[in-house]
Amino acid sequence: MQRINEDIKTGNFKQIYLLYGEERYLKNQYTTRLRKALCQDGDEMNTHFYQGKDFSLGQVIDLAETLPFLAERRVMFFKDTGLFKSGGEKLAEYLANPNDTTFFVFTESEVDKRSKLYKTCLLYTSPSPRDAHE
């Protein structure tokens, strides 16, 4: 969480943020702070929210590859999708080389640290797995 505070303060954002664990209040607080820092006020065209499993990864990836419309970045928020337990392989492959203008914020209750998606996110979110906070 300290890294997120530092990124917000400096304006140097990572392309991927992963917030996970049981502390729902902290996850929500930091997700809100990231949304305010990453997204322009009223920019609904470049801000996307996905919750649960009711979305197509193919459509998400297509949208992620699209340049933002009249904005610096496109931001995609994912909440309790279960992608870090199963089904996230396709997204992990995309995140190995994502569009530079698309940013991702994942908020999950549980993650499988053996999953390809988790390992891919660690490459962007922190210099070492030890810095990933639960």
Where are these regions (language model features)?
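P-loop/Walker A NTP-binding region and its immediately flanking N-terminal helices
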Residues: 1-83, 89
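Short, surface-exposed connector motifs at secondary-structure boundaries
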Residues: 44, 100-103
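A short acidic, glycine/proline-enriched capping/turn motif at secondary-structure boundaries
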Residues: 82-85, 111-113
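Short regulatory helix/loop adjacent to the ATP-binding pocket of P-loop NTPases
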Residues: 112-123
